[in-house]
Amino acid sequence: MADEIKKRINCVFVAGGAWHDIDFARLEILKILSEDERIRTRVFEDYDTAATALDEADFLVTYTCNVTCSVSTQEKLQAFVAGGKRWYALHGTNSILRFLTPKDTQYGELLIEAPRSQPLFMETLGSQFIAHPPVAPFRVEVTQPNHPLVEGVEAFETTDELYLLETHGVLDVILHCDYGGDAKGFVEGKWEQQQHPVFYIHEVDKGQVLYLTLGHCRGHYDMPEFTDYYPTVERCAWDLPVYYTLLRRGLEWAKIPALERISAEAQEDEVKA
């Protein structure tokens, strides 16, 4: 029935921020969205501007890093999800970073801090990025092998940023990794051995957020504060077919409420006719 629905589905996509190849991520996600011709996507670089389009949106997709928003926008994002919509949040969406120079710290070195300056935003997402160890290969485990979002997906290894999170509320974890050790360069850099969410669902009243922490990417020109030409192009999990499987399934998941609504409206129209 879902494939027979011909009505338009509206997506708001926020792609912007720092230290990542946003152009690459934006294009890859738009290509997947375009596989369903019913999806019409409006693209924004920040949440405050995107908030103006949320009233007409059926679902929200985000790939950002260090993009903050006003309290009113945080409230609107939470209300959007709480009202029954879905938000697919990728990689650095939950990241707010502040670089502390040696004179700002007691440690005598450059450190990265994760300020708790957007509490409602992070509560809606269900997590906030705090740190990651140096990029290196790690194993992603399937927490719920029978979950439809990871049906047929087996544990895999990726070279990516292993996100260490502060969580909010109850998370339905679908993929996780195991880690304990140092996240060098971060203020909160000491972590005990434990499981860390990689792919999870967070319920917000009638709606849900799906979060996937994987997906770091960086090109030659994405670190202008530090260098005019970054020597390495980093694609991390984007090099893996399984990552595109998770992207596609997440986007299919995100549009389910819209399809259910359109189907119900069509049935009502048939009854009236």
Where are these regions (language model features)?
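Helical hinge/lid and interdomain linker segments adjacent to catalytic or ligand-binding clefts
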Residues: 10-99
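Extracellular ligand-binding/catalytic regions of CAZymes and related secreted enzymes
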Residues: 2-9, 35, 189-198, 204-273
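Residue-level recognition of short, well-ordered coil/turn positions
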Residues: 38, 85, 114-115, 207-208, ...
